Structures are given as C-alpha cells and as structure tokens.
C-alpha cells in the first residue's frame, strides 16, 4: 500500500565544499524539502511512496519531477501551475562554525495551494500512511487549511498519520505555530519532534535539559512525550536527541513513547558530512519500521541508524539501503570496506 507525503520541495543552492556565501563563485543545485526527503528515503527502502506538492509548470519544475522519479517516488498528484519554486541557500558549517540557511520561498506555487486543489480521496485510495511536517502549514494560511483538509480526509479513510513538528522560527511565531498545530496534531497517530520543538510549539519543556549545551535528561523527555500523548491523543511520540559537540561532530540518539513504555535507542558518535535531512531520515525510518511490523524498539533503532547514516551523505536525500541500515542497527558501525 502507498505512503503519502505532502509539503514543499525547494531548489537547494549550496557553495561547493565548505565555502561561505561571501566566498562562493559557484553553487551546486539540487532539490530538497522535509516531506520529499521522507518520500525518497521510503522509496529507497522499497516502499510505494508518493509525494504531493505544488510545482511551477516550467523546466525547473520538470527537473524536480525527474529527480523524484529517479528515486522511484510517484508524483501522480503533484499540482503544476504558473509561478515560482521556493529556493533555499545552504552554507555548510564545520568545526565550531554552524551551518547557515537562507530561505527565498515566499510566493511559491506550493505555498499558494488552495483547499480543493487536491483530490484527497483519490490521493488516499490504497494508502496506509500519510506524513506531513509543521513546515507545510507554516507556509501560508491557505496551506494550513489544505493540511487540515488532508488530515480530515486521511482520518476518514482510515489512513495512519504522522507529523514531524519541525518548528521554523523564520516561517512563523511560536504563538501561531501553537495555535495551528494544536488543530492538526489531534489527527496524528505518530508525532515526531526534536529536543526543542515541543517547547517552541506547545510550551512543553524537558526539565534538566539544555539543547544549546547538549545536555539531555531522558526522564525530562519522557515527561514531554507523556504530556504530548495525553494532550493530543497520539498513539506514539518520538523525539530525536542531538548532543552537539561541534558543527562537525554530534552524538545522536532517539526515544519512542507508546503511551505506556519508553524505548531509548543506542547512541551514535557522528562525524557529520551533511546534517540537512537528518530528522527526515529518522521519520522515514520510523514509518518504514512500523509499516513493516517491527516492534517499537526495533523501529526506533532502525530510524536512528538510518538517520545516523544520512549524516554521512551529501544533499537532502538519504541514499542508503535497508541492508545498510540494518547492519548499523545490528552493531556494525566499523566503517570497514564492504567487499
């Protein structure tokens, strides 16, 4: 059965290597966006993944579609209109210098989608899962309405729903995010967040934890997950835990709470090649595991391992296989040549 993701995909422009914006004379052009990243990961894992969005009816939109098709993602329900594609500029950090992102996405075709533009009943026919992030309703008031329209249709058709809160302060205020997401999350079966999202969006903070300093208290995050479950009725809450040593080195783990038990993954010490899309690869890994009948603990370990591997891959998309993820989750983190 199909897995549907919905959101905006953008043109990613990045200086080569670790050059800064002020140095760069050339930029590499690729594509990326939260929900598209999830769809590509799932397609790479062998799932029937379909991405729904709005794209400009021009050669840039066509190039984007071709890129998605390259990885086996269905674009049957993509809406194409006259207009522009959102762009984001990415400057990769290193050592103590953090990465930097600049958005140029206002007025994109995706942000301009309206209620009624997408036939959600057709989209969710033969679908088992629907995924979106908090970025999508933040794009515009009408996109918040379209996301709500999608959630209602998915719930009516018995499709399980996941959401990654993905708070972006450059898109909306905490107050507006809390109001809008408070209307959407009650539809969600699996809620995904990072260390700070629950606090930013809903004011639910983990005690004894400091994200900036990389201080993580598991019991504090158990309380966060429990409060989210009780407030919104989610079946599961997953939280990624990133301890930043520097822009080049992070400690990475995650937890999953199912309303009764909390499962905690092993922790990975990562040397980072590209951290963009790390959270999306975690979400894709969870969706894969849960739709394949994994236990909650095994689904979590698969998700964290998939995301760990993504941090070693250039670009938004996670170009790894199920076998590679399973090998790491099973304990093979040596990095030895596979012959």
Where do the model's predicted regions map?
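Histidine-anchored nucleotide/phosphate-binding helix
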Residues: 34-44, 147-153
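Short catalytic helix/loop segments, enriched in acidic residues and glycine
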Residues: 20-39
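Positively charged, low-complexity intrinsically disordered leader regions
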Residues: 1-20
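Conserved N-terminal subdomain of the carbohydrate kinase-like
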Residues: 48-135, 325-339
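Conserved post-catalytic alpha-helical subdomain immediately downstream of the catalytic base
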Residues: 262-332, 339
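A short helix->loop->beta-strand "cap" motif at the edges of active sites that frequently abuts
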Residues: 155-160, 232-235
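Conserved phosphate/ATP/ADP-binding segment of small-molecule kinases
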Residues: 171-258
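Alpha-helix C-terminal capping segments
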Residues: 30, 38-48, 289-292
